[in-house]
Amino acid sequence: MSYYNAYEPTLFIMVGLPGSGKSTFLKRRAHEFSTSRCGYTVVSRDAIRFSLLSDTDDYFAKENEVFKKFTQEIFDGLKVGKDVFADATHLNEKSRMKLLSGVLDCQKNNLDKHVCGYQVAVICMDTPLEECLSRNAKRKGRQLVPRQTIISMSNSLTFPEATDMKYAKVYYI
């Protein structure tokens, strides 16, 4: 495991299926994980998506804009020294690396050229598939994910190893 520095801001990448409890966990327990003197912020990809879409838009209609705003909000929090919780599925290493690359792009494009040092941790929501499906079935409107989509996503879900050197810490919930 990499060295964890309690004085450096942390990007916490949430990992888990829809319905695994990522957002609920953050509402209840994010404060327990944050060590930054500047506090923390939660950046929700779904909240960004729903703020950009009209009622008639396809779920993925503005995916590029959603991703850009998601990574920019993450970078903005890290830049001011906050711990940031990236609330989205991040099912596999490829999606986690895409997120980190997007945040790095924001740093490269930062107009004031402020160098933002931060570390990366992962919080894995290891919730059984049936529980995810049950929770999802209680959702309404756009928050309801098709059952088959979650089942398909479960086949792609990979958690990083606790010893993965890319991350300062890996938590399993």
Question: Where do the PLM segments sit?
Answer:
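A short, structured active-site edge motif that brings together acidic residues
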Residues: 46, 123-128
